[in-house]
Curated annotation (Swiss-Prot):
Pfam families: TRM5-TYW2_MTfase, TYW2_N_2
Keyword set, alphabetical order: Cytoplasm, Methyltransferase, Mitochondrion, Nucleus, S-adenosyl-L-methionine, Transferase, tRNA processing
EC number, UniProt record: 2.1.1.228
A GO MF label: tRNA methyltransferase activity
A GO CC term assigned to this protein in UniProt: mitochondrial matrix
Taxonomic source organism: Caenorhabditis elegans
Oligomer status and interactors: Monomer.
Name of the protein in question: tRNA (guanine(37)-N(1))-methyltransferase
Length: 474
């Protein structure tokens, strides 16, 4: 009994009625609830003075009960009500203090006093977070989702699955520009990185458009991979390029790396590839949308390993030989040497592409040996991967695991990983990293690895952190 009293004593008056608890099908009328709001009536012409000079924000209802506001019209002409939060002005001392503050600014001759404004709060007044808290079982929360254009995509823990349809209806109603809500199933469960979607509410329309760092990206969300959480990562990596960079994106998707790189960094060469024909289709659309000349990005639709072994290797050697033999004009300012940047953003599988680099240039050994060491391009590879544990481990373990995964695939005499950037936490025991490798020519010219059976593509099942990570001492 004591525990229940404490629980309910902490509950706010301004929350949806308890009758909606456990609701799985949206019934808006059930959210209607009469509330008596404490108010003070003031002259409408005094509203500006009160807003500027009297600090009442901690006591007013705030902005969570839209369209209800802190200041509303009174029934009397020329009058306004200051609307207070019932929980915050329960004490007589607090109410007296507020009246004194108002009289000090407006004058003691003003007849100010507390009264009550009766209002029905409805579904329209409650925000999504308050509705979810009221509907879901006590102790279970849901507040995180990702929006891509007009599409909201959700992941649900098992205990929330029975409530997915009402959550979807609420999001459809409450989130600006939302027209479609889907449940996002396993990601990257096939070679095309398609999303396994369940339509929960709204239109069955997955063609949408988003803006990222000022660029337009159009896509069929059901047929390509897009993650809005990676916008800073796209900007970080593309910001490493310059006018002498040779950029090769082995898993380009619809262009989140190559488009900003091309427009903002103006690399010497940009070549994009993706195995998914839909990604290639929408990349070409986005090249046009962003007014990029077609010849600035060479686009391929092929396996990433073959792209690395054939297209990247051929292209780099050709350009390097051209640059190393080109004569310099007198008084010409020497240009910095070009660098190779290969991006592999397929975190569930990209680490399996690393063996393709060993010996990728071996068939050009004679030509490369003629290139002076100071004319040989530096090779940088950005390999995205997941480091995950099945038990609680120290935070430092995840970076060590990411490095180990790369070393296991390169099998070189030393680690080729020069930097491991933590991109984001995927779940409580799963981290996403970008491992940056620098590949020496000894590795690129070494005997290639024998072909191995294709590794199974890991599913990227949980996008939301399911719980906070337990701190483990090292």
């Amino acid at each position: 009994m004591i525990i229940l009293k404490r629980l309910f004593s902490n509950m706010s008056i301004l929350q949806p009625p308890e009758v909606v608890r456990g609701m799985t099908k949206l019934e808006k009328e059930a959210f209607r609830m009469p509330v008596d709001f404490p108010v003070i009536e003031i002259e409408a012409r005094d509203a500006g003075i009160v807003g500027r000079r009297v600090r009442l924000e901690p006591y007013l209802i705030g902005h969570k009960l839209k369209p209800l506001k802190n200041l509303v019209d009174s029934e009397k002409d020329g009058k306004k009500y200051l609307v207070f939060h019932p929980d915050k002005v329960q004490e007589d001392e607090t109410r007296f203090k507020i009246l004194e503050l108002l009289k000090r600014e407006l004058g003691n001759e003003k007849l100010l006093d507390w009264t009550t404004l009766s209002k029905d709060l409805t579904f329209e007044n409650w925000d999504a977070k308050s509705i979810f808290k009221a509907v879901l079982p006590v102790g279970i929360d849901y507040s995180s989702y990702t929006q891509t254009g007009h599409i909201i995509h959700c992941n649900f823990a098992d205990e929330i699955l029975p409530f997915r349809f009402i959550i979807a209806e609420v999001l459809l109603d409450k989130v600006n520009n939302c027209k479609t809500v889907v449940q996002k199933g396993n990601i990257i469960t096939n070679v095309y990185r398609n999303l396994d979607l369940e339509l929960l509410a709204g239109e069955d329309n997955y063609v949408t458009e988003v803006k990222e760092t000022g660029l337009r990206f159009k896509m069929d969300f059901s047929k390509v991979y897009w993650n809005s959480r990676l916008s800073h990562e796209h900007e970080r990596v593309s910001g490493m390029f310059n006018t002498q960079s040779l950029v090769y994106d082995a898993c380009c998707g619809i262009g989140p790396f190559v488009l900003p790189a091309t427009l903002k960094r103006k690399p010497k060469r940009v070549v994009a590839n993706d195995l998914n024909p839909e990604s290639v289709k929408w990349l070409k659309v986005n090249v046009g949308l962003n007014k990029i000349k077609e010849e600035r990005i060479e686009i391929h639709n092929m396996d990433a390993k073959m792209f690395i072994k054939e297209n990247v290797a051929d292209d780099v050697v050709r350009l390097m030989l051209e640059e190393s033999t080109a004569g310099e004009f007198e008084n010409e300012v020497p240009k910095p040497m070009s660098e190779v940047h290969v991006v592999m953003n397929l975190p569930a599988y990209a680490v399996n592409f690393l063996p393709a680099f060993r010996g990728a240039l071996s068939r050009f050994k004679d030509e490369i040996e003629k290139v002076p060491l100071d004319k040989r391009y530096k090779w940088n590879v950005y390999c995205y991967l997941f480091a995950k544990s099945h038990v609680d481990v120290p935070d430092s373990w995840y970076e060590d695991e990411a490095r180990r995964m790369c070393d296991e695939k390169t099998k070189w005499e030393r680690s080729l990983v020069v930097k491991c950037h933590n991109v984001r936490t995927v779940s409580s025991r799963k981290e996403m990293f970008c491992a940056q490798l620098e590949l020496p020519y000894e590795f690129l010219l070494a005997e290639p690895f024998p072909d191995e059976p294709e590794a199974q593509c890991e599913s990227e099942e949980a996008e939301e952190p399911s719980s906070k990570r337990i701190k483990v001492d090292t």
